[in-house]
Amino acid sequence: MNFSSIGNLGCLRSFLQNECNWFSVCKKKLYHEYRCVATSSPVFAVDKFKDCLHCNIIILKKNLDFVFSLAINGIHAGQFATNSIKLKKIIITNDLVYYILELGSLTVTDLHFIPKYNSEHVLNVRPITPNLIYDTCSIVSYDEAKLLTVKGPGENKLIPLGCGSWCLNNMGRYYVYTFVLVYDLYLACFEKNTLPSLSKVVFDMISCNNKHCVFCKDHSKHVEQTGKTVGCTDNQETCFCYTPCKKKMAKISNQDLSSLLCDQELDLLDLIYPEKPTSLSTDINAYVHGHKNQEPVVLRNTNWILIRLDPAISRLILLSCPVCKRIVSR
């Protein structure tokens, strides 16, 4: 890999800081090692490492500067010097801790030796589960919601994800807002690894069966959110990228989920995207309409709550998905 140009070094620095969640591998007196498993990057494009970038970084102090060695997918990528390295510690629980890397300007250097990377190290960290999301989220009040903009200008403009899910990018700090089933219904109706967001439920109701559909087919390009496994995985059951191909008067193919939206069986769903400037609503009827025999049906909003995810969890989820990562970082 050629990192000799300023542009390439800038892309590398941006990738390491903004697209990687770093987990500690070991901390020794002379060096620290961290690991990240990242999905494909929109800025750091390397043909050999297209869909998954498993990165190991070994940081050493040298005089007044810092030097680090980088390996990507088990291949030594280079050594770099910088006058500043900060690792911001993010604590979600005692068994789920990660770091965000902050770097000064980079230059290529050579230590005249290649350190041994712990590429096979298995991280002992807690996974992102629906229970963890419910435990750490905040319920969004009407007053908070009206300060957030779904359509139109505004400081707190939300970025749309799947149906009923959005992201607020506050200077690189991500907050996911989403409708989810009330906790009791989640326990009664869903497996423990599936977050019953409105995005996921609506997708499962109306997605098509065409294996070539770029919207409804599982693209299997996610990575595990806490870096425990290396390589791409199927769509995460806690992600918010679920977007069906048909959004207007879509036929319901999975009636088992209709009862979560309404007391009666529905024929069609209509996904609503506001056309006029408006703030965020706490009512699911603002974003999805149901129909029975061509007649509109009011959906049961009491089954749902609008929540704000912890920003530390939001970052782990969004950066593990190549679609969400590109949407929120624009």
From Swiss-Prot:
One GO location term (cellular component): host cell nucleus
UniProt keywords, alphabetically: Host cytoplasm, Host nucleus, Late protein, Virion, Virion tegument
Highest taxon listed in the record's lineage: Viruses
Chief location: virion
Spans through the membrane: none
InterPro entries in the cross-refs: Herpes_UL16/UL94
Protein's cellular compartments: Virion tegument; Host cytoplasm; Host nucleus
Keyword Ubl conjugation: no
Function comment: Plays a critical role in cytoplasmic virus egress. Participates in the final step of tegumentation and envelope acquisition within the host cytoplasm by directly interacting with the capsid. Upon virion binding to target cell, a signaling cascade is triggered to disrupt the interaction with the capsid, thereby preparing capsid uncoating.
HAMAP family: HSV_CEP2
Family as reported in the entry's similarity comment: Belongs to the herpesviridae cytoplasmic envelopment protein 2 family.
Assembly, per entry: Interacts with cytoplasmic envelopment protein 3 and with the capsid.
Protein name: Cytoplasmic envelopment protein 2
The encoding gene: U65
